[in-house]
Amino acid sequence: MATTSRKKKKVKVTPEGTVHIKASFNNVLVTITDMQGNTVSWSSAGKNGFKGSKKNTPYASQITSESAAKEAYDLGMRYVHVFIKGPGSGRDAAIRALQGAGLEVRSIKDITPLPHNGCRPPKRRRV
């Protein structure tokens, strides 16, 4: 049985929104929302074709941010507030890619959760 392709609904969004970047040691997730928190576009390093240890590189972070930003730009978003979470290597590259895709960054806030001496961290890697 042939599958029917659905046409994606194009909804114009407000020109201002937020970008949530989660840069972990293994992957990069970029979610762009409007000011109410409704998701406009999202992307991840795995969605853009990166596999394994290539997902946590600054280049993967740049490509991921560009793809999410272009989709949001096409829907009418122009100004963003950036929230960064996590210790990953592609944090700065992601912000530069957002600016390169045409979005104006109005503020940058680091919301990485820091424990007040909570759980014991994982042991150090010996490479």
From Swiss-Prot:
Keywords: Ribonucleoprotein, Ribosomal protein, RNA-binding, rRNA-binding. InterPro entries: Ribosomal_uS11, Ribosomal_uS11_bac-type, Ribosomal_uS11_CS, Ribosomal_uS11_sf. GO terms for biological process: translation. Belongs to the universal ribosomal protein uS11 family. Located on the platform of the 30S subunit, it bridges several disparate RNA helices of the 16S rRNA. Forms part of the Shine-Dalgarno cleft in the 70S ribosome. One of its GO terms (molecular function) is rRNA binding. This is Small ribosomal subunit protein uS11. One of its GO terms (cellular component) is ribosome. HAMAP family: Ribosomal_uS11. Part of the 30S ribosomal subunit. Interacts with proteins S7 and S18. Binds to IF-3. SUPFAM superfamilies: Translational machinery components.
